[in-house]
Amino acid sequence: MLMGRLFVKRLCLGMFAFLLLASFTTAQSTQKPLTIETAFAEGGITGRTPESIQWSPDSTTMSFIQRDDAGQRGELWTFNPATAEKKVLVGDAKLTQLSPPLSRLKDDRERERITRYHVEPYIWSPDSRHLLFNSLGQLWLYTIANGTAVQFSSSPHSAGDPKFSPNGKRLAYLRDHDLYVRPVGDGDEQQLTQKGSEDLLNGEVDWVYAEELSVRSNYFWSPDGRDIAFLRMDESKIPAYPIVNWMPTHPTVDFEKYPKAGDLNPVVRLGVVSASGGKTRWISPAQDADIYIPRFGWVRDGLLWFQVLNRAQDKLDLYFADTRTGQSRKMLTETAANAWVYVNDDFRVLKSGDRFLWPSWRDGATQLYLYSFNKATPLASDAHLERQLTQGDFEVLGVKGLDDSAGLVYFSCNKDDPRQRQLYSVKLDGSGLQRISREEGSHDATFSDDGKHYYDTFSALMTPPRLSACDSAGSCNNIWESRNVEPYGLTPPKFLEFKANDGTTLYGQLLLPPASAASGKIPLIVNIYGGPAAQLVQNTWIENWSGSSGLFHQILSREGFAIFTVDNRGTPARNRKFQTAVRHQFGAIELQDQLAALDQLFAQYPQLDRTRVAIWGWSNGASMTIYAMTHSDLFKAGAAVSPVTNWRNYDSIYTERNNGLPTDKTSTSYTDLDLPKVADKLHGSLLLLHGTSDDNVHFQNSIQMVEALVEAGKQFHFMVYPNKTHSIAGATDQTHLFHLIEDHFLRELK
């Protein structure tokens, strides 16, 4: 009897094990394969996210463009938060005419400009009854009521940055480096500025202001529509960098105005011109021509505000100016000793017309402050600090909306965790700090003009993007969701914490290979950025941003690699002390933090193989990759995509903000990160990759590195992407690039 029971028990256990194995085998067989081809295909594994998401001026409607994976076909949708109605406003056939796919642009640099700087393909009219489309430089006016579109201008020359007057009766735009205006109905256009050229930009944004100061427009209508304020940029003294198209039989050259560290900058001047034409009235805030005017706008009719940033970027002045008399007054000055003053879009004048918001990290972290001024005689006295609205050891990451009627400011911050982005509100009296967003992860909100609704793009580490329309209390309706990624069986990385040598907390993450892919000691790949422009360790979905592809790392982990990332001191979204730790001394501290974190990682995870470690990065991460391989013998291999190899090669605003002028004797960055000079110190196998049309980090950087490595007798691998820009965008090129990096690590570490 006992034997019989034992037999039955063993039989049941055997059947259970068989069924479990069969279930596991079935799950494996139904799991979708994740390959470099699928990860970097157009649309990726999640689908193409909605584009050009906007609120109508009357705050009743949210609009967006949804395209197919290839980006060739699409529709413009609207959503009404009051009724929860979602519908197609402009169908595929009409949208193809009004907003053609970017693939029709043959110039990679222009495509990158549009995507990188979020150039909108359409804008709403002030009465919310029309849309103005920019179809490859040709303007079309679309009437919502009847679904018809008429071409606004038939000029063979492209028009850019179009804007309706506040009453919607006129339209301003840029053409051939000058500012024009014309009636929306019948009537002729009028040229408002003169002598525009590639050396003289009237109302147009140049490359360095767009890239490093996030300037998206350089002209603005007055509230009454009578005047336009604009910035003139004189670039005649700026050196031009040649970008060569090598593909024709006879190569062509395009010259880009690009001020490098220590070079002359654009000379800027703020002007006001009547929308009816006439002489420009110039506003002259400072005697020093070597300044930046990074932001300006209208306080009210006849009263301008503008900011003046010194070249060292450690002093920012706010001015008010009477456009009728030309008189101006400095309202406040923001200084940052041994640091820099951040320029952003958080200056907001309240509807009361006598108060404004002002961001500052004067107390050690970026917080919001409320100032007031004399509404009747604004130039009679300085601005007065009313109160600090937020405080704490967290970063306010952007004002997202204002509800003046409720006395509320909505803003993004990382109060809960430096790796998250949450939406908060605070009252204008400084009380009632409250979190609005609910889910853990990263929320990017944009409010309607009345401050009553917002759209939220949300994602988390293992949750791909989702678009929602929400009320100000945080109750949301889903508008769009990514495709389900569960069939790909992605492995969640582990969030980790480390200590720098000075005790500072560093945040990192580790992705270990699945048990089926691991055998013996595990080789480790370090992904690095390490600079002021990017935080890699976040609770957000990173599918295929070039510098840190989460899906590429998932693929590597299935090949038996562990992937590690840590944000060293000098990366953003932490307090002032953390961000400025590397000021004037790029390289050494970043590498110290990386190596300190790696020592702690190896102690915590003894299965990692210290003798098989690689490193890779893009842009600043590529610079740090080469720096690490020339200043440490830990790394057996590395891949550097589009690196700065000498900071004298990079643009003036970014470089000098962090490193001072090349003549500054207190800065070591120009000597310590002159990577060609230490080419003979290279350890490990280097793969270097760059696009020849990179207008951001010039191809010149890699050419100089190649020459130095050859002179030093160092063997290395070099891949050139013809006519590709900094992002080396496109499914074909990205697939090729990431296969190269994959093969490099398989060859060197396996």
Where are these regions (language model features)?
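Disordered, low-complexity tails and leader-like regions
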Residues: 1-2, 78, 530
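Bacterial N-terminal signal peptides that target proteins for export
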Residues: 2-15
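Short alpha-helical segments used as structural interaction elements across diverse proteins
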Residues: 6-7, 257, 566, 731
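Generic detector of N-terminal low-structure segments
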Residues: 9, 18-20, 26, 563, ...
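Basic side chains
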Residues: 9-10, 182, 232, 269, ...
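Beta-propeller folds
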Residues: 13-18, 23-453, 459-463, 469-472, ...
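Serine-hydrolase catalytic core recognition
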Residues: 239-240, 295-297, 307-309, 442-750
